[in-house]
Amino acid sequence: KDRPRWMAQNAQAFFATHLGNQVSSELIAWTVQRCLDCSAKAAVEVVETGFSTDLRKEAGALQVPTLILHGDADASAPLHLTGRRLAQLVPDNVYKEYPGAGHGIFLTHTEQLNQDLHDFIEGSSS
């Protein structure tokens, strides 16, 4: 009924601000607006595809260096159902959990994420 309100209410969980992640009201508003800019049908299809597509076989067949980063406070993709399971499936991966990080890890833990990406790329290219 009220998609903008639902998005705004769930933004706090997306960023895990209840755990002390500092996110400006402007960044929250911008993120909510980005979500609202896509059609409701597209948003539903993305969620539906994520819940109904089984990629376990493909994950187990990966033969490239793989970095898996996941927040331990991700309400959208709970750690025990997603990140940890993926790490068990993908051979020879580098797996890191970010304490206190929600689904918006790329915005709340930017420096750590960028450093981990850099380290992974440097280590994978040698």
Give, region by region, the residue ranges found by the protein language model.
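A short C-terminal helix-loop "cap" of Rossmann-like NAD(P)-dependent dehydrogenase/epimerase domains
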Residues: 1, 5, 91-94
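Generic structural signal for small/hydrophobic residues in well-ordered secondary structure
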Residues: 2, 68-71, 113
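Conserved alpha/beta-hydrolase catalytic His-Asp/Glu region
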Residues: 3-60
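Residue-level signal for the nucleotide or nucleotide-sugar donor/cofactor binding architecture
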Residues: 38, 77, 108
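Active-site phosphate/pyrophosphate- and oxyanion-stabilizing loops and adjacent acidic/basic residues
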Residues: 57, 84-85, 111
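Conserved loop-alpha-helix segment in the C-terminal half of the alpha/beta-hydrolase fold
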Residues: 61-101
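Catalytic active-site module of serine/aspartate enzymes centered on a nucleophile-bearing elbow/loop
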Residues: 90-126
